[in-house]
Amino acid sequence: VFARKAVSTPHRRGAPAGLRMLWAGGNAVDAAIAAAAAMTIVEPVSNGLGSDAFCILWDGKELHGLNASGRAPQGWAPEYFHQRYGRQDKPPRRGVDSITVPGAVSAWVALHERFGKLPFDALMEPAAEIAERGYLVPPVVQQKWAAGAPELQSQPGFRESFLPRGRAPEVGELFRFPAAARALKAIAATNGDALYEGEIAEALAAFAKEQGGALTVKDLASYQPEWVTPISRDYRGYTLHEIPPNGQGIAALIALGILEKFDLASLPVD
């Protein structure tokens, strides 16, 4: 079916963004970044420009790991949460104090600088175009969107961005995301700096302050993703690799160590 190249994403509009990079002469890293950016638009219920990122990459000679999980704002401390939320000593489940510094864009930049081939701004083009022109919302995305709307609609800014008609989009309805398109263009033009030191960073910090949150421009500007050595485990003739903690991959390796003690083939399917 495939000669040499393939791109797979959970949403059918994500893969063409990656393929476009391959057709333009880009490599697998270019394709992965473009597809990831597109997924923040077409599956906003599962992805976002404010999300984290982890990556394990084989360059043909060496295995690399990248941890771009969000760091806590410097203002977070047990005392901070005691003062704002009574006896609570950890972040709340929702609201401005439930968010950490976004890591995904920094991961895209770091991967591109080390392994990418095409210009960084080209990698953001497909996602920005989809956000501007819109896309038809598929059933699975719509179901998650509608399920989360009742709990999230009271969050500041959520209704304006994700419930433009006062409700979640219907299946097959065209959804446009102009604010995300503008953000992607700013990220593209500044090689990601807009999110950490530029206009988007200032807007994020101002919004957090307005809502009484702890996130500051200093938190955003000081953020850096971390290159790490993947951890691994041999299992029945295979070697599996994961990002070390704070990633959760170590749990999978521990589980494999437990499973290795059992003769799974002798057990019933259920």
Predicted region positions:
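Noncatalytic scaffold domains of N-terminal-nucleophile
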Residues: 1-20, 28-197, 201-247, 264-267
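Flexible, polar/acidic helix-loop-strand segments at domain edges
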Residues: 250
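Structured C-terminal helix/loop/strand segments within mature extracytoplasmic catalytic/sensor domains
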Residues: 258-270
